[in-house]
Regions:
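Acidic (Asp/Glu)-rich catalytic clusters
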Residues: 14-24, 82-88, 120-126, 152-158
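The substrate-binding groove and active-site-proximal loops of carbohydrate-active enzymes
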Residues: 1-5, 41-45, 98-110, 135-140
């Protein structure tokens, strides 16, 4: 069975994520993220949930103990979230909303972030899940998205984490979601305001949480 073999390989990899003392690293595992593009998104709701639970059971059979299961979904403006939520050993809900540099619409971005929180946060609380957000505007456009949109949301709501789209390629390609040295102040000042606010906790403030042996 191809699915069983694939799951065994995933289990073997997860087992390697440990330090020299054999302490395994915890992993938030986004099984079958719903992005509207992959093959399993074409499954019916019931078939999708059945597949999700089957993979969970297969990983349990392989004695995987260092994962926290997450349900992840990409937000599409106007669409309702959480319709495929598996409701089976889920601890984290992640919603992804990224704008590409060719379709930047800052008013829509702000409206969408508010709608995501409105839909997802009460749902997560009702199911005893933590809620995290993966987001960003490619090439940034205006750094007010950090200080005025995202920071405001972080201050008003209990959001467990905030992740941004990845930066990659040459700077001239503008495939970045967070500023880097050399970009204009227009794309930096809002980000600096956000990271310097006490509501945000970055790795440098987590001294002692994880130690390198």
């Amino acid at each position: 069975d191809m699915l069983e073999e694939y799951t065994k390989q995933v289990a073997k990899y997860l087992d390697t994520l440990q330090d020299g003392y054999g302490i395994k690293a915890p992993v938030v595992l986004n099984l079958l993220p719903v992005d509207g593009k992959t093959w399993y998104c074409k499954l019916s709701k019931d078939d999708y949930i059945s597949l999700y639970k089957k993979i969970q059971n297969l990983l349990d059979d392989e004695d995987v103990t260092n994962v926290v299961y997450s349900y992840s979904e990409t937000y599409q403006p106007g669409k309702h979230l959480m319709e495929r939520y598996p409701d089976n050993k889920i601890d984290v809900i992640n919603v992804t909303y990224l704008q590409s540099k060719n379709a930047i619409d800052l008013p829509l971005y702000q409206k969408s972030i508010k709608e995501i929180v409105k839909q997802t946060l009460p749902f997560a609380q009702d199911h005893n899940n933590v809620f995290g957000l993966t987001t960003g505007v490619e090439s940034i456009g205006d750094s007010s998205i950090f200080s005025e949109t995202l920071l405001t949301v972080l201050k008003q709501h209990h959001i467990a984490y905030l992740m941004f789209g990845r930066n990659q390629g040459e700077p001239i390609e503008e495939h970045y979601y967070t500023p880097y040295p050399g970009v204009s102040n227009k794309k930096t000042h809002g980000f600096m305001e956000m990271i310097n606010d006490e509501v945000c906790v970055f790795l440098e403030k987590l001294n002692g949480l994880y130690l390198e042996h």
